[in-house]
């Protein structure tokens, strides 16, 4: 399940992120990759323990809290602090699957990466190439979104970033451990959630149909959630 979440950041927040990243220190992105992924990865990253990463990561986590669509799609139990990457001309990240388990910095605990998320910080007309290509059973999906928009997809997905041929592509990325680790079940709950939202727009909240659907949603979540 791929979900496009628009307008996660405001224009002012995007401008702040860009200003901080412009002034930040960029390092070889392979420093944070596993052995296999490091051979496929060619980009730059902001050090995850830097003041810039912490400040902007907290900004993004606050923005996620006000995004019902992200929370409906990911059903997050834990969210890893966001990281920040940059692809300049000639840079890319060949096909790979994200690692299954991630350490949460400073928390002394680990997170199962169920859901991957990329938040775009550069508008599409600022660069050429650089599409995030996600493979699933329906084929390949090339994603290139406006700054401030986000794509949410299963961390089990084979994916890549195409080579940049002009300009520079900046983004934040992070992983979530979901309360519902199975993507098929998450997709069913997401569809049901969106259906309930549509029903509630047309009917009152105390309409029997709205109550019945909401009850089904919560009872399925109760059955499948792992806390």
From Swiss-Prot:
Please give one Gene Ontology molecular function term for this protein.
2-oxoglutarate-dependent dioxygenase activity
* Fe2OG dioxygenase domain segment(s): 78-178
Where do the annotations place Fe cation binding? 96, 98, 159
Alphabetical keyword list = Dioxygenase, Iron, Metal-binding, Oxidoreductase, Vitamin C
Q: Which Pfam families match?
A: 2OG-FeII_Oxy_3, PKHD_C
Swiss-Prot/TrEMBL cofactor(s): Fe(2+); L-ascorbate
Which positions in this protein are listed as binding 2-oxoglutarate? 169
Q: Give the domain of life.
A: Bacteria
What is the protein name given in its UniProt record?
Answer: PKHD-type hydroxylase Mnod_1077
Co-factor binding comment: Binds 1 Fe(2+) ion per subunit.
Q: Supply the EC number(s).
A: 1.14.11.-
Ranked from the top, the taxonomy reads: Bacteria, Pseudomonadati, Pseudomonadota, Alphaproteobacteria, Hyphomicrobiales
**Does the keyword section mention Metal-binding?**
yes
Translocase is among the record's keywords: no
* Database matches in SUPFAM superfamilies: Clavaminate synthase-like
Query: Where does the UniProt annotation place the signal sequence?
Result: none
InterPro entries, per database record: Oxoglu/Fe-dep_dioxygenase_dom (IPR005123), PKHD_C (IPR041097), PKHD_hydroxylase (IPR023550), Pro_4_hyd_alph (IPR006620), Pro_4_hyd_alph_FE2OG_OXY (IPR044862)
Question: What GO terms in the biological process aspect are recorded for it?
Answer: DNA damage response; intracellular iron ion homeostasis
């Amino acid at each position: 399940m791929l979900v496009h979440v628009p307008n996660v950041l405001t224009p002012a927040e995007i401008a702040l992120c860009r200003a901080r990243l412009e002034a930040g220190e960029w390092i070889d992105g392979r420093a944070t990759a596993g052995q296999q992924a490091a051979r496929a990865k060619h980009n730059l990253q902001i050090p995850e323990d830097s003041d810039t990463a912490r400040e902007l990561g907290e900004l993004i986590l606050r923005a996620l809290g006000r995004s019902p669509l992200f929370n409906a799609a990911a059903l997050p139990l834990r969210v890893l602090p966001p990281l920040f990457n940059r692809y300049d001309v000639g840079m890319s990240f060949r096909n790979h699957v994200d690692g299954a388990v991630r350490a949460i910095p400073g928390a002394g605990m680990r997170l199962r990466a169920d859901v991957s998320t990329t938040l775009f910080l550069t508008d599409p007309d600022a660069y050429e190439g650089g599409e995030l290509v996600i493979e699933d059973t329906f084929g390949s999906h090339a994603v290139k979104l406006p700054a401030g928009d986000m794509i949410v997809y299963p961390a089990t997905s084979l994916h890549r970033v195409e080579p940049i041929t002009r300009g520079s592509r900046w983004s934040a990325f992070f992983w979530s451990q979901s309360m519902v680790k199975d993507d098929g079940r998450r997709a069913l709950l997401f569809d049901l959630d969106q259906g309930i939202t549509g029903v509630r727009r047309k009917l009152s909240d105390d309409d029997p149909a709205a109550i019945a659907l909401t009850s089904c949603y919560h009872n399925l979540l109760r059955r499948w959630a792992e806390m």
